[in-house]
Structure formats: C-alpha cells, structure tokens
Amino acid sequence: MNYLKLTFDKLEVGEINDLVAHESCGAISLFVGTTRDNFDGKTVVLLEYEAYEAMALKTMNQICEELRARWPDIKHIGIHHRLGTVPVKEASVVIAVSSPHRKSSLEAVHFAIDELKKSVPVWKKEQYADGEGCSEWKENKECSWSKSHRDNHIL
C-alpha cells in the first residue's frame, strides 16, 4: 500500500511509521527532512512550502511505482510532505518504507528522497531573522527543471 499525503498539518513521524508497519516486515526505514536554522550564514526562522498538488501526488505515486519495480519485496511506502509554514526543527518531509529485510527499505528510502527532490513540484521559501535580508524562494538544484540542473546536464 502507498500512503501519500500533502498536508498543512504537523507531520507525525510515529504515525507514518505505524502506517507502513506490517507483521511480515522486519525493517522500517525512515527519512525525516527537517528545517535547519541556517543557510549561507543567514539565520533561518522557518520555511514556507507550496506545491502543484495534483502533479506532486501523481509524481509521488510514480516514485512508489519505481521503488516497487526496483525492490519488489517492499510492503508499504509512506511519503508525506508538509505545505505552508514549517518552523525550525520540524519535519517538512517523511518517507517510510517497510520490507522483510533492511537492505531493500534502506536503499528505497535513499532513492525516494533523491527522486522526490528531483521531480516533485514542491517549492520552498526561506524566511530569515530580522535584519538578515529578505526571504527568498530557493531553487532546488537537483530538480530537473531548474536552471542549475540544465546548465550541468545535456538535455
């Protein structure tokens, strides 16, 4: 089963872990991406996320299909991404994968976050502390439609 969600609510890691748990699985691997308090010497106070929601969910489902093709023993996959305001230390994305053994779930989670960063249409804006400059929308250099990606790859 795939558990995909875009939400403005706080992400609960334990809840997502419970969604993917299964009695036939001896492994659940998790990736939790959180808001850090700094970037390029500036103090970050929060991130704001926006998404093209229908396309984001479709792309997340395609990632799940790819995970299942590469690691057929995977049981459940959870990908939850937060939208709106995400303060420092809170989770913006949680990816959870269950499988009978750890190798598949660990590799799948690593692949999933890389693919999510490359292909899912979610954008973030950093809000800085007072006096440290304006907030700014961040380009995801891994994203296939970014200028940085195009400059470094032959299309």
UniProtKB/Swiss-Prot annotation:
- Record's Pfam families? MoaE
The record's principal subcellular location, in a coarse class, is cytoplasm
The catalytic activity of this protein is classed by the Enzyme Commission as: 2.8.1.12
Q: Which residues form the signal peptide?
A: none
* Reactions listed under catalytic activity: 2 [molybdopterin-synthase sulfur-carrier protein]-C-terminal-Gly-aminoethanethioate + cyclic pyranopterin phosphate + H2O = molybdopterin + 2 [molybdopterin-synthase sulfur-carrier protein]-C-terminal Gly-Gly + 2 H(+)
GO biological process, alphabetically ordered: Mo-molybdopterin cofactor biosynthetic process
Sorted alphabetically, the Gene Ontology cellular component annotations on this record are: molybdopterin synthase complex
Where in or outside the cell it occurs: the entry states: Cytoplasm
* Main enzyme class: transferase
Tell me yes or no: is Cell membrane among this UniProt entry's keywords: no
Q: Which UniProt keywords apply?
A: Cytoplasm, Molybdenum cofactor biosynthesis, Transferase
Enumerate the GO terms in the molecular function aspect.
Answer: molybdopterin synthase activity
Which InterPro entries does the record match to this protein?
MoaE_sf (IPR036563), MOCS2B_euk (IPR028888), Mopterin_biosynth_MoaE (IPR003448)
- Transferase in keyword set: yes
Report residues binding substrate.
Answer: 101-102, 117, 124-126
Pathway listed for it is:
Cofactor biosynthesis; molybdopterin biosynthesis
Annotated CDD domains: MoaE
Subunit details = Heterotetramer; composed of 2 small (MOCS2A) and 2 large (MOCS2B) subunits.
Additional remark text: This protein is produced by a bicistronic gene which also produces the large subunit (MOCS2A).
Q: What does this protein do?
A: Catalytic subunit of the molybdopterin synthase complex, a complex that catalyzes the conversion of precursor Z into molybdopterin. Acts by mediating the incorporation of 2 sulfur atoms from thiocarboxylated MOCS2A into precursor Z to generate a dithiolene group.
The record's listing under PANTHER family reads: MOLYBDOPTERIN SYNTHASE RELATED
Q: Name the family.
A: Belongs to the MoaE family. MOCS2B subfamily.
**What is the designated name of this protein?**
Molybdopterin synthase catalytic subunit 1
- Which gene codes for it? Mocs2-1
